[in-house]
Amino acid sequence: MAMKGDGKSISFVEDTAVAPEKLRDFIDKFLEIIHRHGTTAGIYAHASVGCLHVRPVVNMKTSAGVKQFESIANEVANLVLEFGGALSGEHGDGLVRGPFMERMFGTELYEGFRTIKRTFDPGGLFNPGKIVDSPPLTSNLRYGSDYQTPTPLAEFDHTEHGGLGRAVEMCSGVGACRKTLSGTMCPSYMVTRDEAHSTRGRANTLRLAMTGALDFNDPRDAGLGDRTVYDVLDLCLECRACKTECPVGVDMARFKSEFLSDYWTRHGTPLRARILGHIHDLSSVGHQLANVVNPLLSQRWFRTLNEYLLGIDHRRSLPTWAPVTLSDQWVNDSENEAPNTPRVTLFRDTFTQYYDPNIGLAAADVLRSAGFTVGLGPNVCCGRPLISQGLLAKARQRAEQTESYLLPTATAGQPIILLEPSCLSSLVDDIPSLLSGTAQQHAKTCLLYTSPSPRD
């Protein structure tokens, strides 16, 4: 399903089922249809009950692809009848298989379906077009021969997918982001149960916005500037669960960063984004005033002001600055370094440096106990706050600075140990996409503290 480019493995004949003893011959003839149409297919699922999911690869952006789609569907429907099977083994009929229901069940039974439908729903209000009186197979296509993939300007490198537009189109609509009982994707959908706040809903909204299919009241809103898109993306936590759990690896966190970058350009960057994006620099300043600021953080009036200015709920406790930073407590062990002792560099993230240095000190102790000499990295930010807030031009500048500091360590082949997963994600995934060339080199040397030992 995770195919790049315009040809996609799509679901329209994916639920056929026959008696298990007939499955081999059925699939052989099914694949003959696929190959005769000059394409391939993905196959998976439940062979033991005679229901293999076959998803042909079709480019629905061309008239030839649409004809191919319709022809395959018709031939497969006839094949199912030949083998005495079912066109819908477990997924239901809906719009995509509705046009074949009379062929599958016969005119008499089909008219019985219609009678029941008209008796209980004379106005056709409930799920119109499903099962009976369905529109033509090609009448509700997401794409079509007149569809043009949008090519919006992007800050990240989306060359792998053929641009930002095609990266958004990677969403296949399978709906794994709508699960509620397992995994992490998608936390906002798990809470709201609203399609708009699922990864699929957001991908569809972005696609519609980029193709001009949304109604815009303000000329500034055309494309990715629409407030509707902002509202749909607002609850995205940028946790990147979709990047790992989505079958096609949709990276909604990156799309949100791209959107915010464009949106701020059109509408102005709010104070909240500026402050949270520059939290590394502000933490350095705040540390100098820790004795004054720390007592304020627990004051109700200060929290209320914080909620008004930054949107941080007044009930949320705020981290306090440590009296002494990690770097001020660090003891450099290079002077006592034994010959041939493997050396690692501990990345000095913002939180560990200014708020909880004990985490960094404890990690260093563990690494030393494991036989490593530990050096402390420079006081640079991974760029995650800027990226998350959509300040991508600033993020690129920060990435260049961070890259210049980390490159000597990376060139020496020295592992860089990180304590924060979000920092690792930024250094390994985002910075190489914002930059080019040597950024790939430092990415290969970064390891999360909970990863296997660098020796491994």
Segments predicted by a language model, with ranges:
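Iron-sulfur-cluster electron-transfer modules
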Residues: 4-9, 215-381, 385-446
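Short, hydrophobic beta-strand segments
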Residues: 4-16, 52-62, 96-103, 344-349
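Phosphate/diphosphate-binding loops
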Residues: 16, 20-30, 34, 61-83, ...
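A short linear hydrophobic-aromatic micro-motif
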Residues: 38-44, 84-86
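Short, conserved phosphate-binding/catalytic loop or strand-edge motifs used
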Residues: 48-53, 92-98, 380-383
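Iron-sulfur cluster-binding cysteine motifs and their immediate structural context
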Residues: 128-130, 170-208, 241-260
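C-terminal accessory/binding modules appended to enzymatic or scaffolding proteins
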Residues: 164-183, 190-192, 338-362
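Conserved small/polar residues in nucleotide/adenosyl-binding loops
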Residues: 449-456
